[in-house]
Structures are given as C-alpha cells and as structure tokens.
A protein has these predicted regions:
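Membrane-interface segments of envelope glycosyltransferases acting on lipid-linked substrates or membrane lipids
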Residues: 1-365
Length: 365
C-alpha cells in the first residue's frame, strides 16, 4: 500500500506530530509512505532526515487547480493508493486531483473544531462524495463535521495518542536551569503564542491565583509566536514577572513536563485533541483545561486526570489550580489516573491499528 500524506504547512504543531507518528510507524512496514507539502518547516526537515520521498508544491487555496494537477501527476507517477489529507484546503485539492487521476482514494483527518459558513457547508456537500473516509480526532469534532455537511456514515473518531511511558519520568534539568527550588509548585503550559490558546486568560487567572495560593509557585509558558511581546508586557504590568516565565520555543518539552507538578491548557478555540495534554498526562501531570474541542474527551469524571473549567472564568481556573496545589492526595490520585488513561484510551499503538483499519477499509481489504 502506498500512502501520500498531504499538508500545506509542514511546521511544528500537533497536526505535524500526528503525520510524523503515522509515517514513522507505517513506512517500510505496512506501507510505503510519501509526503507532500507547500510551506517548509520542522516537519519537512524531519521527513528529509528519515529519507521519506517528499514533494513540495504551492497550494494557494482549496480550489487550486494547478496544485491539483501537480498532485495528480505525483500520484500517477508513484502509483499512490491513498492520499491522507490534513485540513480542508488539502482535502479539497486532493478531491480536485481526482479530475486528472481517478485511482487514488482519499482519507481526510479533521484537526479543527470550527463551525463552517453556509457557503462552506454547501461546498462540503459537493466535495464529500469523493472523500472515501473522514477521521475526526475528537467527538465534538465529529458533531461539527456532521453539522458542516459531512455524512455521519463516513466519519470515524480516532483519538490522537502517545507512546505510554508507564509512569516513568526522566530526571528533569528545568528547575536547575531556571533556578526553581524543589518545593516550588510548577505549573506548565506548552503552546503557540497565538490568540486561540487563551494565554491572556491564563495570565489573568494566575493573577487571581497569586492572591490565594499559600506556597511558592511558578507558571512556565513554553512556545513562540506573534503574541510574545504582548504577553511579556501583560505579565510585567501585573507585577508577575517572578511568577510567570516565557521560555520561548523549546525542543525539550518532555524535560520541562517532567520537572513540573501540573499542566494547564487555556485554549479558547481551535482545540481538537491536544497532543500537549496527552504528553502531560504521559508525564503523570494532572491537567486543568478549558472546556473546548476535545479537551473534555481527555479530562472528565471518568478519567479523573484533572479539572475542566469554562474559558473566561478566571476564578474557576485559579481555584482549580489552587486545589491541586493544596490537596496532595488528590494530586497523587490524578497522577495515577493519567497513566491509566494513556494506557487504556490514548495508547499510540491502538491509534496506529485503528487508522490502518481505515486505510484497509477504503482499499476494500
């Protein structure tokens, strides 16, 4: 089986991690993998390092006929069986490529939780008959896909996943690097510095936490983006420079997590199923997360891995963090539940099996 993974921006976010995981697992085992992209970044570098057959071409918009022709030529010359597209632009271009080469099947993974406009919904209904299967990475995403014009019978919910750590945490160097004492309560979030990640809301919540917490604490924000200066000024204006540290982009995410006590996700929108939360759980970190997208699939009463709060409720966010900082028994139980949940629900090997079952289904096997 020959599978081509199609993505516009080959960057360093969760979707790119999703694609890399699949390629690393399937290539030269169950399948021969190929990769096509438009804008270069970390993922395109990683594919080159792994010697994956790679193609770069411009994808201006979802209706880019020139891109569709290039894609069809790649599929014809390499006898591609399946295009696995990420995001709507890539999905539409994949469908248009079938005008020029009809043999390729199309699988589309939706990584977004956005309600489409009426125009998009109409177009979706025209396009989806030519999409063989749709994967949603969370349950709320599936409901939105149906609302956006995708047929329910074509949609499979397959969560993102990680390789279970079994509760083993590496010795972290982050506290020593930043001069953080062992008795300091370390709260961490790893996110692009983008409005959708709700970091202004998180900073405002920490301002309230600062008034009630009884122990030393620090919030570490790992990530880069266009809001860096704005967030830095906000932190300084609130007098929280000693309590909130902007770390910039880091390649040692697991090292940071292993030196932390809890994780927070403050997203306001666009969150499907967060890899960062899964990685935090894998490092035994109970998590406080906003009730958006697929966060509730991970953090809920059944999993017992932390607390869900409504976006914008700074009191709820501050109080949830405070409770975890003060209740050691609750914190320890949450750590145990994190490992159990990763093993049973978000185990990457299960995700590999379920995704390949989709490929076999579209190939009639």
């Amino acid at each position: 089986m020959k599978i081509l993974y199609l993505i516009n921006h080959a960057g360093k976010a969760g979707t790119e991690k999703y694609v890399l995981n699949l390629v690393e697992r399937y290539n030269e085992r169950e399948a021969k993998c190929y990769f096509a992209y438009n804008e270069p970044g970390l993922l395109s570098e990683q594919m080159a390092e792994r010697k994956i057959s790679t193609f770069q071409f411009e994808m201006k918009n979802p209706y880019d006929i020139k891109a569709a022709k290039v894609l069809s030529r790649i599929c014809r010359e390499n006898k591609i069986d399946i295009i696995h597209a990420q995001y709507p632009r890539e999905c539409y271009i994949a469908v248009l490529s079938k005008l020029f080469y009809k043999k390729t099947k199309i699988v589309f993974t939706s990584h977004l939780t956005l309600s489409n406009s009426i125009a998009w919904k109409i177009t979706n209904r025209l396009i989806t008959p030519f999409v063989d299967r749709v994967i949603s990475v969370c349950n709320s995403g599936k409901e939105l896909l149906i609302n956006n014009g995708y047929p329910k019978k074509k949609i499979d919910v397959i969560y993102n996943g990680v390789i279970p750590s079994g509760g083993k945490r590496e010795k972290s160097t982050i506290r020593e690097e930043l001069g953080i004492s062992e008795d300091t309560f370390v709260i961490t979030t790893l996110a692009r510095l983008h409005y959708s990640k709700g970091l202004e809301f998180l900073i405002d919540s920490i301002e309230k936490l600062d008034r009630i917490i009884k122990r030393n604490y620090v919030l570490l924000i790992g990530g880069d983006g266009e809001l860096y200066d704005e967030l830095k000024n906000r932190i300084e204006d609130k007098g929280l420079s000693e309590k909130i540290k902007l770390l910039g982009f880091r390649k040692d995410a697991y090292n940071i997590l292993c030196g932390s006590d809890i994780y927070v996700n403050s997203s306001m929108c666009l969150e499907a199923l967060s890899f960062a939360i899964l990685e935090a759980l894998n490092a035994s970190l109970p998590t406080v997360a906003t009730n958006v997208g697929g966060n509730g699939d991970i953090i809920n009463e059944n999993t017992g891995c932390g607390k869900i709060v409504e976006y914008g409720d700074t009191d709820a966010m501050a109080n949830a963090i405070y409770e975890l900082s003060e209740n050691s028994e609750y914190l320890e139980k949450g750590r145990e539940n994190c490992i159990k949940t990763i093993n049973e629900v978000f185990n990457l090997e299960k995700i590999f099996e379920d995704t390949f079952d989709v490929y076999k289904k579209v190939m009639g096997k």
